[in-house]
Amino acid sequence: MSKNIGTLWFGIGKVEEKQLDGLDFVIMIAIAKIDDETKFRKDMYKSKRKELSEIWNGDYYLDIANIVRFTPSACNTQPWFVESSEKELKVYRYRKPGKRGIMPIEMVKYYNQIDIGIFLCFIELCLNKNNIKFERTLHIEENVDNEKNLTATYKIN
């Protein structure tokens, strides 16, 4: 929350029109000015998120890890896993079988791919905020049904 503006990601939002002005519907987000600060979470660390050890392997860039673990995801599935070393971050889209929250099974892969893109954005924002120079390589998933897919590699300069 900044300046009393709140956002909510409607991961399973539905629209009447699947296309508008030649653009396909992808995702829905609500943005609103909130006049009552009590409606905001005061301590982000009290939100329901996976433990750091479930999403981050390695002892590097833990200050960044402790922020990016709060990246929003559909139904809080947090479908990512990072392997960290001094000179590299490897980001995987990780799908634990059977874990999908309330999300319909046929939508898991679709929303998890959007989630991983949002996660990459958070990583890059944190790297930039910490003045950490990097080169990103995106990887095409060969088989989206795999439990773990390499999505991006960040070479730290």
Predicted regions span which residues?
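Acidic, surface-exposed loops and disordered segments
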Residues: 1-157
